[in-house]
Design a protein with these regions (language model features):
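Long, contiguous amphipathic alpha-helices that act as assembly "spine/axial" helices in icosahedral shell
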Residues: 1-11, 55-62, 151-159
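Sequence/fold signature of self-assembling virion shell proteins
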Residues: 26-49, 60-61, 67-193
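Alpha-helical scaffold segments that mediate packing/assembly in large oligomeric complexes
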Residues: 1-45
């Protein structure tokens, strides 16, 4: 998946620990909203690194945990009007689209995140301009069966697919872990500074 293939981010000299962005120490600010703007700046820096490594474009979407999305909303930089008509409702069980940062970077919430992280990625306007491709063999197949316990009819659905890396990223198409330049991931620590 994207999260396992992404290169480690937050490698700039301004971060105390490589691969980890600590909101308390790595961003400068007098109060939380200013420190959260430092997190937005780190996302922009990762987007710039993607542009330099791929020569295709800056990162244009973020996959993050719900706490990171809440921090982005608290920074005042996340426009949640496209996502919600009233206000950002960061909820792991609801819609995963949280909003847009600075009018160009879409933010999605990972409902299965166990820790705080952010992954910046790039996908171009062309469907072939991406870091990974979903390749279905059988789009969707319905299977009918009878339950062993109560002999009630059951319906199941299955699909077969493959995930392959962009062939211009990896020569063999397998997508080595932590090597795809279309994605940058880093851990976010100390959100509640």
């Amino acid at each position: 998946s994207i999260l396992t293939k992404a290169k480690i981010g937050a490698l700039q000299s301004s971060t105390a620990v490589s691969g980890i962005f600590d909101v308390g120490t790595d961003s400068d600010g007098r109060w939380m909203a200013e420190k959260f703007k430092g997190l937005v700046m780190q996302l922009e820096r990762e987007a710039n690194v993607i542009a330099k490594e791929t020569r295709r474009g800056k990162g244009n979407y973020v996959i993050c945990s719900s706490d990171v999305a809440s921090a982005l909303a608290a920074s005042g930089m996340l426009d949640y009007n496209p996502a919600m008509s009233t206000n950002l409702n960061v909820d792991d069980t609801g819609n995963t689209f949280a909003g847009v940062i600075n009018g160009r970077m879409k933010v999605y919430i990972d409902p299965y995140a166990t820790g705080d992280y952010a992954c910046v990625g790039y996908r171009g306007s062309n469907p072939y301009d991406a870091g990974m491709f979903y390749c279905p063999y059988v789009p969707l197949q319905m299977v009918k069966a009878v339950g062993e316990e109560d002999f009630q009819p059951r319906i199941g659905f299955k699909t077969r697919y493959g995930m392959v890396a962009n062939p211009f990223v990896a020569a063999d198409g397998t997508g080595t872990n932590r090597a795809n330049p279309y994605f940058r991931i880093f851990r976010v620590d100390d959100i509640m500074v």
